[in-house]
Amino acid sequence: MSAAWLAIDGLGLTEGSTRIIDGVSLQLGAQRTVVLGPNGAGKSTLLRLIHGLLHPTGGSLRWPQTLSQAMVFQRPVMLRTTALANVIYGLKLKGHTATECEQLARQSLARVGLEGLAKRPARLLSGGEQQRVALARAWALEPQLLILDEPTASLDPASSREVERIINDIAASGARILMTTHNLGQARRIAEEIVFIDRGRIVEQTPVELFFTQPQTEAAQRFLKEESP
């Protein structure tokens, strides 16, 4: 594995008497990491802790170097405006001029195949198109780390394939990818490394092919058996 870009030590999140994330320790160094686990295992919560949307009740996250980040959710928020303006919004917050914002936003929409829908109200787009707008909005910011939480969970197969293509293109541009998915085929196509979480604890962290061919724990073996078609 490459040098770690994130070291997590004893990370925990407790709500009342419930431990949602329970003493997670791991180092992330792969360019493309997919977090797998059963429903309620803590996958999305872990990603939100890493992105800073939630504050841990214990442990620490250490970044050897600061990485610019963007996060895309299963159901992205679309502003009540055009697809183009949705992408421009983030660029404007980053301090680009109006001319730069429009140029960069149009380029980003073109990269996800939506240049022809730039002036369409974003909330009238299909679910797959909205997810591509969200990816364009994130990609326009040139993040060094892109975090994706179930980016294709609500999409049809064709839209899912298109989103996968875009994720791979973003990775090819140099960004690190950290994502969750329930689609095992998708995980195998995208990931270099699998982190398997169960009941808030990291159970396995292995190269993708090793995880799918020789899972080391009963929990992972059971998960693959239950989730495989």
Language model segments and positions:
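Helix-to-loop junction immediately C-terminal to a conserved catalytic motif
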Residues: 51
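Conserved ABC ATPase signature
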Residues: 121-125, 129
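Conserved ABC ATPase "signature" region
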Residues: 99-117
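Catalytic Walker B motif of ABC-type/P-loop ATPase nucleotide-binding domains
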Residues: 146-149
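Helix N-cap at the start of a conserved alpha-helix in ABC-type nucleotide-binding domains
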Residues: 157-159
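H-loop/switch region of ABC-family ATPase nucleotide-binding domains
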Residues: 181-182
